[in-house]
Amino acid sequence: MKITLTRTFIALAVCLAFIGACLSPHAVQALTGVYYIVQENDSLSSISQTFHTSPARIELANYLTDNDPIFPGEKLLVPGFNGLSGTLTQIKIGLGDTPLSLMRHNHGDASAFTRINFLTSPDAIVVGQNLYTLTKDDAANTRLPVTDGMTGLELAAEQGLNPWTAAEYNSLSGPWDLIANDILYLPASGTAGSGDILPGVSALNLTALGQGKTAVFTATAAADAQLSGSLTFNVEDVDQEQEDQATTPPTPVNPANPPVLHDRYPLNLFANPDGTLGALQGVPRMTRVPGTASLLLTARTADGHSYSLQQNIQVKSEDYGYDSPMQVADNFVDPKVTVPEDDLVFKTVAPASPDKLWNGAIQPPTATPDCQTDTYGKLRSFNGSNFIYWHSGIDYCGAVGDKITAVADGTVIYTGQLDVRGNATIIDHGHGVYSGYYHQSKIEVSMGEQVKAGQEIGLIGDTGRVTGPHLHLDLFVGDVQVDSTDWLNGLYP
């Protein structure tokens, strides 16, 4: 009997050893850990940089040698994430996403999300950023924003759920643990919810933000939903620098850390022909980069509840170049002269009238549009200053008396003589879009007059701060001077 048991045990041990030898190291390691699926153009070096490790550690964890290639679709164990398990899935941060909402959507935990993405705080995520989540299953769920004043019982009644279901599904301590502006996820099979990003808002989109460019915001909202919002930019304070230079020697370069203003611009939302809501907003030329803008959205439901969302959005740097240093009369760069004039102009172009009067691309304002003496956005130095100034529009060639025409249909809302801009005309094209025509020798329109695209409105001159006759064209979008080149090319609706 003992001999039979001994032989049986030996046979079983040999069998297990044989099975273990047949298993590949990849099969053994697949039992636990965090795994990354190799993508096209990946290398061990790029993967190790993403996850703050080294190629050698990845090779060791996956039983690879220096000569072993990796292939798209292959799963690699990523070292350094002890205690976590699952497959890494790359996501692009969208409007409305937070670490907590992403955790709930993927049935994970916020600390794991922070850990695999090496985040220092929830505010560190930026719309458009590529991050990773740990995927364990593909259980369907539905997004539900929590409005102010909502209780667990109200949520349960609206969604047809047991009051404890939402709490358990979202790792809450109980039905009472709801916080306004939070985002919950509910089992898709047990809810009639729509998966709105905000209450009554099912889709949001914001084009890339670039210095001096025009951003396009769109939202798909229910008829009874009220949506409002704003964008805040960190903008270098030129006026403060002008005052500082009165007591310090001028230098030919930008200071390393110029003063910054937090400029907030409301989104001027209007209905689009397709039923969506839309807004156009200029990005200030001197927005600090690298850096982010802050988007704030508030949705109010028909019953009076509201939900607010704040997110950071990356602002791209645009290289507009430099102008040669210039010499002008001191009063033309004196803040006592320039600041009141700027205040007048920006107050004039701040309102957003409800009627959209332009249609498609705007038209050049002169008969020789390809003849330009200066372009938008170039940094400038006046009278030995730092390069803290910048050119706000396009300068078109011309002789005194050459015709100036309107770039689009609109209403004349300002005519007059200004110290820096000379004889100036400003036209309102609706929805917060304005055009400005400066340095004219003669203004040929009057306040309140309706004009058509291509209509003569004045004559080129050399009034104001100029070195010779020309037309300066400004384009304002959302109270910000923007690069009109894209508008002339018809890139905006």
Located regions from the model:
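Bacterial N-terminal signal peptides
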Residues: A11-C22
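Primarily a LysM-type cell-wall glycan-binding module
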Residues: V28-H52, L76, G80-H107, Q129, ...
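Short histidine-centered loop motifs in beta-beta connectors
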Residues: N62-Y63, N117-F118, N170-S171, T415, ...
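Conserved, short, structured surface segments that act as functional micro-motifs
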Residues: L161, L172, L178-N181, L186, ...
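Surface-exposed, glycine-biased beta-strand/turn segments
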Residues: L309, Q314-R421
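Short, well-structured beta-strand-loop connectors
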Residues: K403-V412, V445-I460
